Amino acid sequence: MDNVSSAHEYIEHHLTFLTLGKGFWSINIDSMIMVWMVGLLFIGVFRYVAIRGTKGVPGRLQCFIEITFDFVNNLVKEIFKTEDKLIGPLALTIFVWVFLMNSIDLLPVDFVPALTRLFGVEHFRDLPSADVNVPVSMALGVFILIIGYTLKNKGIVGFIKELTTQPFEHPLLYPVNFLLELITLISKPISLGLRLFGNMYAGEMIFILIALMPWWMQWALSVPWALFHILIVFLQAFIFMVLTIVYLAMATEEH
């Protein structure tokens, strides 16, 4: 019974946020700190490479940054056919930012909480993408861009026409069309945010459960899971980026 109780307390401790306020208006400070930290790391590294970049033989870091840049740039050109100065930087920012946030999950479960405890902080959850507020907030930003791009390219009349005149062309079925299209539109940011949250939350939980096992089982299970989780970390960042580009491309195309 004591083991069950201690295991429950351990899990609860690792899933408790450092919050400011209570209820709906509470703010998870730990998530905000980690989001800003990885964001500043991203900006700092890319700025460093941009300033010190050479035209000769590039170093390893510069090669890695250039490969990442070309990978995202080619993907954007392939999906988003219209010339737009925002989409490329947006896609690169989303991919690298989400990837860095997800990569925090590869740190030992007790590493960051142990560090924060030295400063008197009892609860500190270090994986921002496992906080539903972060992925959903990012998805909400994408949703606003979708609406903005739709209105920019099709106008209010075109947007309303798109919501009401398909898939059924008969005027009596326009209300049905509107309901179906509205559900489709709203489901995009919801699925985008919850997909990232669900995968990272599940991965975090598995690491926590492995940490509760005897030390010899921890090594036997954590290493294979960490290696597999690297793929999840990359894929979730890739999927979030690709779907963002696809949704924005759809917002600029005529149906």
Swiss-Prot record:
It holds the Pfam family ATP-synt_A. It is a multi-pass membrane protein. InterPro entries: ATP_syn_F0_a_bact/chloroplast, ATP_synth_F0_asu, ATP_synth_F0_asu_AS, F0_ATP_A_sf. Keywords: ATP synthesis, Cell inner membrane, Cell membrane, CF(0), Hydrogen ion transport, Ion transport, Membrane, Transmembrane, Transmembrane helix, Transport. The keyword Signal does not apply. GO terms for molecular function: proton-transporting ATP synthase activity, rotational mechanism. Gene3D superfamilies: ATP synthase, F0 complex, subunit A. One of its GO terms (biological process) is proton motive force-driven plasma membrane ATP synthesis. PROSITE patterns: ATPASE_A (PS00449). It is found in: Cell inner membrane. The chain crosses the membrane at residues 26-46, 86-106, 131-151, 205-225, 230-250. Signal peptide: none annotated. It comes from the Bacteria. GO terms for cellular component: plasma membrane; proton-transporting ATP synthase complex. Its main location: membrane. The keyword Ion transport applies. Key component of the proton channel; it plays a direct role in the translocation of protons across the membrane. NCBIfam families: ATP_synt_6_or_A, PRK05815.1-1. Belongs to the ATPase A chain family. F-type ATPases have 2 components, CF(1) - the catalytic core - and CF(0) - the membrane proton channel. CF(1) has five subunits: alpha(3), beta(3), gamma(1), delta(1), epsilon(1). CF(0) has three main subunits: a(1), b(2) and c(9-12). The alpha and beta chains form an alternating ring which encloses part of the gamma chain. CF(1) is attached to CF(0) by a central stalk formed by the gamma and epsilon chains, while a peripheral stalk is formed by the delta and b chains. This is ATP synthase subunit a 2.
